[in-house]
Protein backbone atom coordinates (compact mmCIF):
# COMPACT_ATOMS: atom_id res chain seq x y z
CA UNK A 1 0.00 0.00 0.00
CA UNK A 2 1.43 3.32 -1.06
CA UNK A 3 1.49 6.08 1.54
CA UNK A 4 -0.03 9.44 0.65
CA UNK A 5 2.56 12.07 -0.16
CA UNK A 6 2.10 14.04 3.13
CA UNK A 7 2.65 10.87 5.15
CA UNK A 8 5.78 10.15 3.13
CA UNK A 9 7.11 13.54 4.18
CA UNK A 10 6.11 12.82 7.77
CA UNK A 11 7.89 9.46 7.65
CA UNK A 12 11.04 11.07 6.25
CA UNK A 13 10.85 13.74 8.95
CA UNK A 14 10.43 11.08 11.60
CA UNK A 15 13.48 9.30 10.30
CA UNK A 16 15.50 12.52 10.41
CA UNK A 17 14.22 13.19 13.95
CA UNK A 18 15.22 9.74 15.20
CA UNK A 19 18.54 9.87 13.36
CA UNK A 20 19.29 13.27 14.91
CA UNK A 21 18.64 11.89 18.38
CA UNK A 22 20.78 8.82 17.72
CA UNK A 23 23.66 10.85 16.27
CA UNK A 24 23.54 13.73 18.76
CA UNK A 25 22.75 11.97 22.01
CA UNK A 26 23.90 8.39 21.54
CA UNK A 27 26.50 7.81 18.82
CA UNK A 28 28.52 11.06 19.00
CA UNK A 29 28.93 11.01 22.82
CA UNK A 30 30.25 7.45 22.57
CA UNK A 31 32.68 8.44 19.81
CA UNK A 32 33.75 11.58 21.72
CA UNK A 33 34.27 9.65 24.94
CA UNK A 34 36.32 7.05 23.10
CA UNK A 35 38.43 9.77 21.47
CA UNK A 36 39.01 11.50 24.81
CA UNK A 37 40.13 8.23 26.38
CA UNK A 38 42.61 7.82 23.55
CA UNK A 39 43.90 11.40 23.64
CA UNK A 40 44.16 11.76 27.44
CA UNK A 41 46.11 8.57 28.06
CA UNK A 42 49.88 8.93 28.35
CA UNK A 43 50.54 7.00 25.15
CA UNK A 44 53.80 7.51 23.31
CA UNK A 45 53.99 10.35 20.77
CA UNK A 46 50.64 11.90 21.69
CA UNK A 47 50.37 15.66 22.23
CA UNK A 48 49.49 15.14 25.87
CA UNK A 49 52.46 12.84 26.45
CA UNK A 50 54.89 15.35 24.96
CA UNK A 51 53.40 18.17 27.03
CA UNK A 52 53.41 15.99 30.14
CA UNK A 53 57.09 15.13 29.72
CA UNK A 54 58.20 18.69 29.05
CA UNK A 55 55.82 21.54 29.75
CA UNK A 56 56.24 23.86 26.72
CA UNK A 57 55.64 27.04 28.70
CA UNK A 58 56.87 28.44 32.00
CA UNK A 59 54.90 28.18 35.21
CA UNK A 60 54.59 31.12 37.58
CA UNK A 61 56.79 30.76 40.64
CA UNK A 62 56.43 33.64 43.08
CA UNK A 63 58.14 33.91 46.43
CA UNK A 64 57.00 36.21 49.24
CA UNK A 65 59.27 36.66 52.27
CA UNK A 66 58.19 38.06 55.63
CA UNK A 67 60.38 40.84 56.98
CA UNK A 68 60.34 41.22 60.80
CA UNK A 69 60.20 44.83 61.95
CA UNK A 70 60.41 44.52 65.77
CA UNK A 71 63.25 42.07 66.38
CA UNK A 72 64.46 43.62 69.64
CA UNK A 73 60.95 43.48 71.10
CA UNK A 74 60.45 39.89 69.97
CA UNK A 75 63.60 38.86 71.81
CA UNK A 76 61.90 40.20 74.94
CA UNK A 77 58.68 38.27 74.33
CA UNK A 78 56.66 40.72 72.23
CA UNK A 79 54.27 39.64 69.49
CA UNK A 80 56.08 39.60 66.10
CA UNK A 81 55.16 42.24 63.52
CA UNK A 82 55.77 41.25 59.91
CA UNK A 83 55.67 42.92 56.52
CA UNK A 84 55.41 40.89 53.34
CA UNK A 85 58.12 41.52 50.71
CA UNK A 86 57.38 40.28 47.19
CA UNK A 87 56.62 38.84 44.87
CA UNK A 88 59.99 37.70 43.60
CA UNK A 89 58.91 36.28 40.26
CA UNK A 90 60.62 33.30 38.63
CA UNK A 91 59.82 31.38 35.49
CA UNK A 92 59.66 27.70 36.39
CA UNK A 93 60.36 25.24 33.59
CA UNK A 94 59.37 21.66 34.35
CA UNK A 95 60.61 18.52 32.64
CA UNK A 96 60.50 14.78 33.26
CA UNK A 97 63.73 12.96 32.44
CA UNK A 98 64.86 9.34 32.25
CA UNK A 99 61.32 8.43 31.20
CA UNK A 100 60.63 4.72 30.70
CA UNK A 101 57.42 2.92 29.73
CA UNK A 102 56.45 -0.40 31.29
CA UNK A 103 53.89 -2.08 29.07
CA UNK A 104 53.27 -5.03 31.40
CA UNK A 105 51.62 -2.94 34.12
CA UNK A 106 50.74 0.18 32.10
CA UNK A 107 53.10 2.49 34.02
CA UNK A 108 55.81 5.08 33.39
CA UNK A 109 58.82 5.86 35.55
CA UNK A 110 60.59 9.21 35.51
CA UNK A 111 62.67 11.73 37.44
CA UNK A 112 61.94 15.43 37.84
CA UNK A 113 63.95 18.43 36.65
CA UNK A 114 63.04 22.04 37.46
CA UNK A 115 64.78 25.15 36.14
CA UNK A 116 64.16 28.65 37.51
CA UNK A 117 64.81 32.01 35.83
CA UNK A 118 64.46 35.26 37.79
CA UNK A 119 62.27 37.93 36.17
CA UNK A 120 62.75 41.26 37.96
CA UNK A 121 60.42 42.91 35.43
CA UNK A 122 57.55 40.77 36.71
CA UNK A 123 58.53 41.01 40.37
CA UNK A 124 57.25 43.55 42.87
CA UNK A 125 58.05 47.23 42.23
CA UNK A 126 61.79 47.82 42.47
CA UNK A 127 62.64 44.34 43.74
CA UNK A 128 65.98 43.01 42.49
CA UNK A 129 66.72 40.23 44.96
CA UNK A 130 69.44 42.29 46.64
CA UNK A 131 67.14 43.61 49.37
CA UNK A 132 68.28 42.78 52.90
CA UNK A 133 65.53 41.04 54.80
CA UNK A 134 65.29 40.22 58.50
CA UNK A 135 63.68 36.83 59.01
CA UNK A 136 63.85 33.96 61.53
CA UNK A 137 67.18 32.15 61.35
CA UNK A 138 65.99 28.80 60.11
CA UNK A 139 69.19 26.96 60.93
CA UNK A 140 69.56 28.18 64.50
CA UNK A 141 65.88 27.62 65.27
CA UNK A 142 65.91 24.20 63.60
CA UNK A 143 68.97 23.04 65.54
CA UNK A 144 67.45 23.99 68.87
CA UNK A 145 64.01 22.55 68.06
CA UNK A 146 65.52 19.24 66.96
CA UNK A 147 67.66 18.79 70.07
CA UNK A 148 64.85 19.97 72.34
CA UNK A 149 62.65 17.21 70.93
CA UNK A 150 65.24 14.42 70.81
CA UNK A 151 67.74 15.17 73.61
CA UNK A 152 66.72 18.21 75.68
CA UNK A 153 69.55 17.55 78.11
CA UNK A 154 71.98 18.51 75.33
CA UNK A 155 70.65 22.06 74.88
CA UNK A 156 73.68 23.56 76.67
CA UNK A 157 75.93 21.89 74.11
CA UNK A 158 73.76 23.24 71.30
CA UNK A 159 74.29 26.78 72.58
CA UNK A 160 78.05 26.28 72.24
CA UNK A 161 77.51 24.92 68.73
CA UNK A 162 75.48 27.99 67.75
CA UNK A 163 78.06 30.38 69.14
CA UNK A 164 80.87 28.51 67.38
CA UNK A 165 79.24 28.16 63.96
CA UNK A 166 77.41 31.50 63.81
CA UNK A 167 79.89 33.67 65.74
CA UNK A 168 77.91 34.41 68.90
CA UNK A 169 74.62 35.70 67.41
CA UNK A 170 72.75 38.31 69.44
CA UNK A 171 69.29 37.04 68.46
CA UNK A 172 67.51 34.28 66.52
CA UNK A 173 67.08 36.32 63.33
CA UNK A 174 68.96 36.33 60.04
CA UNK A 175 69.89 39.44 58.07
CA UNK A 176 70.20 38.23 54.51
CA UNK A 177 69.78 39.29 50.90
CA UNK A 178 66.62 37.87 49.39
CA UNK A 179 68.39 36.12 46.51
CA UNK A 180 70.91 34.54 48.90
CA UNK A 181 68.27 32.88 51.03
CA UNK A 182 66.20 31.88 47.98
CA UNK A 183 68.82 30.49 45.58
CA UNK A 184 72.45 31.55 45.99
CA UNK A 185 72.72 30.20 49.51
CA UNK A 186 74.13 31.40 52.82
CA UNK A 187 77.43 30.02 54.10
CA UNK A 188 77.43 27.90 57.24
CA UNK A 189 80.98 27.66 58.48
CA UNK A 190 81.54 24.12 59.73
CA UNK A 191 85.32 24.37 59.54
CA UNK A 192 85.55 24.22 63.34
CA UNK A 193 87.72 22.09 65.57
CA UNK A 194 85.77 22.61 68.81
CA UNK A 195 83.73 19.61 69.91
CA UNK A 196 80.25 21.19 70.00
CA UNK A 197 80.30 22.89 66.55
CA UNK A 198 81.98 19.89 64.96
CA UNK A 199 79.42 17.48 66.43
CA UNK A 200 76.53 19.64 65.23
CA UNK A 201 77.94 19.84 61.69
CA UNK A 202 78.57 16.09 61.59
CA UNK A 203 74.94 15.39 62.54
CA UNK A 204 73.74 17.90 59.98
CA UNK A 205 75.63 16.14 57.21
CA UNK A 206 74.50 12.71 58.38
CA UNK A 207 70.84 13.74 58.38
CA UNK A 208 71.09 15.15 54.82
CA UNK A 209 69.16 18.27 55.76
CA UNK A 210 66.90 19.60 53.00
CA UNK A 211 68.28 22.63 51.17
CA UNK A 212 71.95 22.14 52.13
CA UNK A 213 74.80 21.77 49.64
CA UNK A 214 78.02 20.36 51.08
CA UNK A 215 81.07 22.15 49.71
CA UNK A 216 84.82 21.55 50.19
CA UNK A 217 86.60 22.62 53.38
CA UNK A 218 83.56 21.87 55.54
CA UNK A 219 81.59 24.77 54.13
CA UNK A 220 77.84 24.21 53.92
CA UNK A 221 75.60 26.34 51.74
CA UNK A 222 71.92 26.59 52.59
CA UNK A 223 69.09 28.02 50.48
CA UNK A 224 65.37 27.54 50.14
CA UNK A 225 65.30 26.50 46.48
CA UNK A 226 68.89 26.37 45.27
CA UNK A 227 69.19 22.59 45.48
CA UNK A 228 66.16 22.24 43.18
CA UNK A 229 67.38 24.54 40.44
CA UNK A 230 68.61 22.77 37.29
CA UNK A 231 69.21 19.59 39.29
CA UNK A 232 67.64 16.22 38.57
CA UNK A 233 65.72 15.00 41.60
CA UNK A 234 67.05 11.49 42.37
CA UNK A 235 63.62 10.13 43.32
CA UNK A 236 62.13 7.75 40.74
CA UNK A 237 58.38 8.28 40.37
CA UNK A 238 56.05 5.61 38.94
CA UNK A 239 52.62 6.57 37.59
CA UNK A 240 49.87 4.90 35.58
CA UNK A 241 49.66 5.68 31.85
CA UNK A 242 45.88 5.25 31.69
CA UNK A 243 45.91 3.25 28.45
CA UNK A 244 44.14 0.27 30.01
CA UNK A 245 41.94 2.39 32.27
CA UNK A 246 41.78 6.11 31.56
CA UNK A 247 40.54 6.85 35.08
CA UNK A 248 43.94 5.71 36.39
CA UNK A 249 45.94 8.16 34.27
CA UNK A 250 48.69 9.88 36.25
CA UNK A 251 48.01 7.92 39.44
CA UNK A 252 51.15 7.61 41.57
CA UNK A 253 51.80 3.95 42.37
CA UNK A 254 55.40 3.97 43.63
CA UNK A 255 58.31 6.15 44.70
CA UNK A 256 61.77 4.65 44.31
CA UNK A 257 60.11 1.32 43.66
CA UNK A 258 58.16 1.32 46.94
CA UNK A 259 54.34 1.22 46.86
CA UNK A 260 54.10 3.66 49.77
CA UNK A 261 56.27 5.97 51.85
CA UNK A 262 57.40 5.23 55.40
CA UNK A 263 57.08 8.59 57.13
CA UNK A 264 53.66 8.84 58.75
CA UNK A 265 51.27 6.37 60.35
CA UNK A 266 48.73 4.05 58.71
CA UNK A 267 47.04 5.14 55.47
CA UNK A 268 48.77 8.54 55.44
CA UNK A 269 51.73 6.73 53.85
CA UNK A 270 49.64 5.71 50.84
CA UNK A 271 49.87 7.35 47.42
CA UNK A 272 46.43 8.77 46.80
CA UNK A 273 45.89 10.68 43.59
CA UNK A 274 47.92 11.74 40.57
CA UNK A 275 51.34 13.37 40.37
CA UNK A 276 49.60 16.74 40.01
CA UNK A 277 50.46 17.22 36.34
CA UNK A 278 47.63 15.20 34.75
CA UNK A 279 44.15 14.23 35.90
CA UNK A 280 41.45 11.81 34.71
CA UNK A 281 38.65 13.04 32.39
CA UNK A 282 34.87 13.09 32.85
CA UNK A 283 34.91 15.11 36.07
CA UNK A 284 31.70 15.91 37.95
CA UNK A 285 30.97 18.23 40.82
CA UNK A 286 30.71 15.16 43.07
CA UNK A 287 34.32 14.14 42.44
CA UNK A 288 37.03 14.88 45.00
CA UNK A 289 40.28 15.25 43.14
CA UNK A 290 43.46 13.99 44.74
CA UNK A 291 47.12 14.61 44.03
CA UNK A 292 50.30 13.63 45.82
CA UNK A 293 52.75 16.36 46.83
CA UNK A 294 56.32 15.07 46.73
CA UNK A 295 57.55 18.24 48.46
CA UNK A 296 55.29 17.68 51.48
CA UNK A 297 55.14 13.86 51.40
CA UNK A 298 51.35 13.72 51.45
CA UNK A 299 48.22 13.63 49.34
CA UNK A 300 45.87 16.58 49.08
CA UNK A 301 42.16 16.37 48.34
CA UNK A 302 40.28 19.07 46.47
CA UNK A 303 36.52 19.46 46.27
CA UNK A 304 34.20 21.23 43.85
CA UNK A 305 33.44 24.86 44.67
CA UNK A 306 31.64 26.38 41.67
CA UNK A 307 31.28 26.63 37.91
CA UNK A 308 33.76 28.98 36.22
CA UNK A 309 35.12 29.69 32.75
CA UNK A 310 38.55 30.20 31.22
CA UNK A 311 39.04 31.93 27.86
CA UNK A 312 35.54 30.96 26.77
CA UNK A 313 35.73 27.36 27.99
CA UNK A 314 33.44 26.21 30.79
CA UNK A 315 35.37 24.90 33.79
CA UNK A 316 34.83 23.47 37.27
CA UNK A 317 36.68 25.08 40.16
CA UNK A 318 38.10 22.89 42.89
CA UNK A 319 39.65 24.15 46.13
CA UNK A 320 41.84 22.58 48.80
CA UNK A 321 43.39 23.40 52.16
CA UNK A 322 45.90 21.99 54.62
CA UNK A 323 43.27 20.31 56.80
CA UNK A 324 42.08 20.11 60.38
CA UNK A 325 44.26 17.40 61.88
CA UNK A 326 42.84 17.51 65.38
CA UNK A 327 39.22 17.03 64.28
CA UNK A 328 39.46 15.02 61.05
CA UNK A 329 40.09 11.32 61.86
CA UNK A 330 41.28 10.73 58.30
CA UNK A 331 44.18 13.16 58.83
CA UNK A 332 45.24 12.19 62.35
CA UNK A 333 47.75 9.67 61.04
CA UNK A 334 49.91 12.68 60.07
CA UNK A 335 50.33 13.43 63.78
CA UNK A 336 52.73 11.53 66.04
CA UNK A 337 49.67 10.67 68.13
CA UNK A 338 46.07 11.97 67.88
CA UNK A 339 46.66 13.96 71.08
CA UNK A 340 49.61 15.78 69.51
CA UNK A 341 47.81 17.12 66.44
CA UNK A 342 48.29 20.81 65.75
CA UNK A 343 45.43 23.33 65.49
CA UNK A 344 43.36 23.64 62.32
CA UNK A 345 45.18 24.75 59.19
CA UNK A 346 48.77 23.99 60.19
CA UNK A 347 50.84 20.84 59.60
CA UNK A 348 54.13 19.64 61.06
CA UNK A 349 56.38 18.56 58.14
CA UNK A 350 59.45 17.78 60.22
CA UNK A 351 59.40 14.11 59.23
CA UNK A 352 59.19 14.96 55.55
CA UNK A 353 61.78 17.74 55.25
CA UNK A 354 63.94 16.59 58.17
CA UNK A 355 63.67 20.17 59.38
CA UNK A 356 61.27 21.23 62.17
CA UNK A 357 59.01 23.42 60.06
CA UNK A 358 55.28 23.79 59.57
CA UNK A 359 53.12 24.53 56.55
CA UNK A 360 49.86 26.44 56.27
CA UNK A 361 48.03 28.49 53.72
CA UNK A 362 49.59 31.95 53.21
CA UNK A 363 48.91 34.55 55.90
CA UNK A 364 47.50 31.69 58.00
CA UNK A 365 44.33 31.59 55.90
CA UNK A 366 41.81 29.12 57.41
CA UNK A 367 44.13 28.59 60.39
CA UNK A 368 43.00 28.45 64.00
CA UNK A 369 42.99 31.77 65.85
CA UNK A 370 45.33 30.35 68.48
CA UNK A 371 47.99 30.60 65.76
CA UNK A 372 46.89 33.69 63.85
CA UNK A 373 46.62 35.82 66.99
CA UNK A 374 50.34 35.36 67.69
CA UNK A 375 51.46 37.51 64.74
CA UNK A 376 50.64 41.03 63.54
CA UNK A 377 50.70 42.19 59.93
CA UNK A 378 48.93 39.30 58.20
CA UNK A 379 45.94 39.84 55.90
CA UNK A 380 44.49 36.47 54.81
CA UNK A 381 42.40 36.59 51.63
CA UNK A 382 40.83 33.47 50.02
CA UNK A 383 41.30 34.89 46.52
CA UNK A 384 44.97 35.72 47.05
CA UNK A 385 46.04 32.94 49.39
CA UNK A 386 43.82 29.92 48.69
CA UNK A 387 44.57 26.79 46.65
CA UNK A 388 42.38 26.70 43.54
CA UNK A 389 42.29 24.72 40.31
CA UNK A 390 39.99 25.18 37.30
CA UNK A 391 39.45 22.05 35.19
CA UNK A 392 37.72 21.51 31.87
CA UNK A 393 35.56 18.64 33.16
CA UNK A 394 35.12 16.56 30.00
CA UNK A 395 38.83 16.12 29.26
CA UNK A 396 40.14 16.74 32.78
CA UNK A 397 42.48 19.43 31.42
CA UNK A 398 43.93 21.75 34.05
CA UNK A 399 43.29 25.25 32.69
CA UNK A 400 44.21 27.52 35.60
CA UNK A 401 45.75 26.51 38.92
CA UNK A 402 47.24 28.34 41.86
CA UNK A 403 49.01 26.29 44.50
CA UNK A 404 50.03 28.38 47.49
CA UNK A 405 51.81 27.25 50.61
CA UNK A 406 53.41 29.07 53.54
CA UNK A 407 56.38 27.75 55.50
CA UNK A 408 56.58 28.54 59.20
CA UNK A 409 58.87 27.86 62.14
CA UNK A 410 58.53 28.00 65.90
CA UNK A 411 60.17 30.63 68.11
CA UNK A 412 60.84 28.14 70.89
CA UNK A 413 61.28 29.47 74.40
CA UNK A 414 63.86 27.71 76.59
CA UNK A 415 65.93 28.84 79.55
CA UNK A 416 68.84 26.64 78.46
CA UNK A 417 69.95 29.06 75.71
CA UNK A 418 70.36 32.79 76.34
CA UNK A 419 68.90 34.10 73.07
CA UNK A 420 65.88 31.77 73.44
CA UNK A 421 64.87 32.42 77.04
CA UNK A 422 62.35 35.23 76.39
CA UNK A 423 60.98 34.30 72.96
CA UNK A 424 57.15 34.30 72.61
CA UNK A 425 56.99 30.52 72.01
CA UNK A 426 54.81 30.84 68.91
CA UNK A 427 54.70 29.54 65.34
CA UNK A 428 55.61 32.36 62.95
CA UNK A 429 55.70 32.74 59.14
CA UNK A 430 58.95 32.71 57.16
CA UNK A 431 57.91 32.81 53.48
CA UNK A 432 55.24 31.57 51.12
CA UNK A 433 55.23 30.33 47.55
CA UNK A 434 52.74 30.76 44.73
CA UNK A 435 53.11 28.15 41.99
CA UNK A 436 50.69 28.79 39.16
CA UNK A 437 49.81 27.50 35.73
CA UNK A 438 47.76 29.25 33.06
CA UNK A 439 47.13 27.28 29.90
CA UNK A 440 48.37 29.56 27.13
CA UNK A 441 46.50 30.59 23.97
CA UNK A 442 48.15 27.93 21.81
CA UNK A 443 46.91 25.05 23.93
CA UNK A 444 43.52 26.62 24.59
CA UNK A 445 43.08 26.90 20.81
CA UNK A 446 44.21 23.29 20.38
CA UNK A 447 41.71 22.12 23.00
CA UNK A 448 38.91 24.05 21.32
CA UNK A 449 39.70 22.60 17.89
CA UNK A 450 40.05 19.03 19.10
CA UNK A 451 37.16 18.97 21.51
CA UNK A 452 34.76 21.87 21.50
CA UNK A 453 34.43 22.82 17.84
CA UNK A 454 33.42 19.25 16.82
CA UNK A 455 31.11 19.16 19.84
CA UNK A 456 29.46 22.44 18.86
CA UNK A 457 29.13 21.40 15.21
CA UNK A 458 27.45 18.16 16.20
CA UNK A 459 25.31 20.10 18.65
CA UNK A 460 24.08 22.39 15.87
CA UNK A 461 23.52 19.49 13.48
CA UNK A 462 21.61 17.38 15.99
CA UNK A 463 19.26 20.20 16.91
CA UNK A 464 18.78 21.08 13.24
CA UNK A 465 17.93 17.46 12.45
CA UNK A 466 15.60 17.12 15.41
CA UNK A 467 13.87 20.42 14.62
CA UNK A 468 13.61 19.69 10.89
CA UNK A 469 12.35 16.17 11.54
CA UNK A 470 9.76 17.35 14.04
CA UNK A 471 8.52 20.10 11.72
CA UNK A 472 8.35 17.65 8.80
CA UNK A 473 6.35 15.17 10.88
CA UNK A 474 3.90 17.80 12.07
CA UNK A 475 3.55 19.33 8.60
CA UNK A 476 3.04 15.95 6.93
CA UNK A 477 0.43 14.85 9.44
CA UNK A 478 -1.32 18.20 9.29
CA UNK A 479 -1.53 18.22 5.49
CA UNK A 480 -2.65 14.60 5.48
CA UNK A 481 -5.59 15.32 7.76
CA UNK A 482 -6.37 18.54 5.91
CA UNK A 483 -6.63 16.62 2.62
CA UNK A 484 -8.88 14.00 4.24
CA UNK A 485 -11.18 16.60 5.73
CA UNK A 486 -11.47 18.40 2.41
CA UNK A 487 -12.12 15.06 0.66
CA UNK A 488 -14.88 14.17 3.08
CA UNK A 489 -16.45 17.59 2.62
CA UNK A 490 -16.38 17.29 -1.17
CA UNK A 491 -17.95 13.83 -1.07
CA UNK A 492 -20.76 14.99 1.16
CA UNK A 493 -21.60 17.91 -1.18
CA UNK A 494 -21.75 15.69 -4.26
CA UNK A 495 -24.48 13.41 -2.74
CA UNK A 496 -26.87 16.19 -1.60
CA UNK A 497 -29.86 17.12 -3.95
CA UNK A 498 -31.53 20.50 -4.21
CA UNK A 499 -35.28 20.34 -3.54
CA UNK A 500 -37.49 22.47 -5.81
CA UNK A 501 -40.78 23.38 -4.11
CA UNK A 502 -42.46 23.82 -7.55
CA UNK A 503 -41.74 20.23 -8.45
CA UNK A 504 -44.78 18.20 -7.54
CA UNK A 505 -42.94 14.95 -7.61
CA UNK A 506 -42.46 13.08 -4.34
CA UNK A 507 -39.28 11.36 -5.60
CA UNK A 508 -36.51 11.44 -3.03
CA UNK A 509 -33.31 13.00 -4.34
CA UNK A 510 -30.63 12.47 -1.80
CA UNK A 511 -32.83 13.64 1.10
CA UNK A 512 -35.51 12.07 3.20
CA UNK A 513 -38.99 13.61 2.69
CA UNK A 514 -40.87 13.62 5.94
CA UNK A 515 -44.19 14.74 4.52
CA UNK A 516 -45.98 17.02 2.00
CA UNK A 517 -46.79 20.59 2.77
CA UNK A 518 -50.48 20.96 3.61
CA UNK A 519 -52.75 23.10 5.64
CA UNK A 520 -53.34 21.97 9.13
CA UNK A 521 -56.83 20.44 9.66
CA UNK A 522 -59.64 22.64 10.85
CA UNK A 523 -61.13 21.76 14.16
CA UNK A 524 -64.95 22.43 14.63
CA UNK A 525 -65.91 23.38 18.10
From Swiss-Prot:
InterPro entries: CD36_fam
Alphabetic keyword roster: Cell membrane, Disulfide bond, Glycoprotein, Membrane, Olfaction, Receptor, Sensory transduction, Transmembrane, Transmembrane helix
Tissue expression per record: Principal component of the olfactory cilia membrane. Localizes to the somata, dendritic neck and cilia of the olfactory neurons (at protein level). Not detected in the axons of ORNs, the cytoplasm of auxiliary cells or non-sensory structures. Expression is universal among ORNs but differential between neuron and sensillum types.
Family, similarity comment: Belongs to the CD36 family.
Bilayer disposition of the protein: Multi-pass membrane protein
Lineage: Eukaryota, Metazoa, Ecdysozoa, Arthropoda, Hexapoda
Intervals, Cytoplasmic compartment: 1-11, 478-525
Name listed for the protein in its UniProt record: Sensory neuron membrane protein 1
Sequence ranges of Basic and acidic residues compositional bias: 516-525
Extracellular face of the membrane: 33-456
GO cellular component: cytoplasm; plasma membrane
Regions that span the bilayer: 12-32, 457-477
MF term (GO), any: scavenger receptor activity
Region (Disordered) residue spans: 496-525
Amino acid sequence: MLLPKPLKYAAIGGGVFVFGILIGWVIFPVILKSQIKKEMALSKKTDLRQMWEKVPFALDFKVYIFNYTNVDEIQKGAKPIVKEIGPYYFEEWKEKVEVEDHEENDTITYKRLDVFHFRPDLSGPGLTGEEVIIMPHLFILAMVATINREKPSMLNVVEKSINGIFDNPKDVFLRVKAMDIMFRGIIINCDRTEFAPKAACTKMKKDAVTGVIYEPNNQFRFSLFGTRNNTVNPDVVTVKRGIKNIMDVGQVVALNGKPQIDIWRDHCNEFQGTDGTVFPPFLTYKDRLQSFSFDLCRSFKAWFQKKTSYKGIKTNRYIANVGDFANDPELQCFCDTPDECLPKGIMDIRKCLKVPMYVSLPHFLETDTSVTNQVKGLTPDPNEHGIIADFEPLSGTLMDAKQRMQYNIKLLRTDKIAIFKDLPDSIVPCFWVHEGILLNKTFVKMLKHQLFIPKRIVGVIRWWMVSFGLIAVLAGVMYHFKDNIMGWAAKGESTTAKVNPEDGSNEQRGVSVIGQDREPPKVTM
